[in-house]
Amino acid sequence: RLLDLLKKLRAAGIELKDIDFGGGVGVCYRDETVEPIENLVLGLKSRLTQSGFDHLRIVMEPGRSIVAAAGLLLCSVQYVKTTPVKHFLITDAGMNDLIRPALYAAWMPVLPIRQSDCPEVLFDVVGPVCESSDWLARDRVLPAQAGELLAVTMAGAYGMSMASRYNSRRL
């Protein structure tokens, strides 16, 4: 469709110098297959060249692909809660610190900071905010003890910019 639009613009006497493909370059949080940005650019350049638009400068905003891995949220397990249905690690960090899991159901890697002799159990990692949606990760196998330190990695994209003082919590 873009090539059709470029052809219509050219037919109307409008020649562009740049073409901006915006953002949306993927990030591998878990086991997704993310096309390397080089492949995307080479593919775009090839299609533009084949269609007679090789003069266009390609502009892209790499966004999350640059900053996601540059940040992590460090938190401490405050309590271990066990119910007949599920086990929970309640941390001192919550949805006000990292909203993406609660808001978008974003899968974020969670790793223990130290090696532990504690048994590893399937947990939901949740925060201290009085909201049922205050969770950082679901169904993770982690050490089960108060005082454990956890790192929620890949939090550089929108982690700080979307953090808030919701529910009178400090940043």
Kindly give the residue locations of the regions a language model identified.
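Short, solvent-exposed loop/turn segments at secondary-structure boundaries
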Residues: R30-E35
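Glycine-rich beta-strand-to-loop/alpha-helix junction loops that act as flexible
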Residues: I19-G26, P62-R64
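Short, well-ordered coil/turn segments that N-cap beta-strands
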Residues: A12-K17, D54-L56
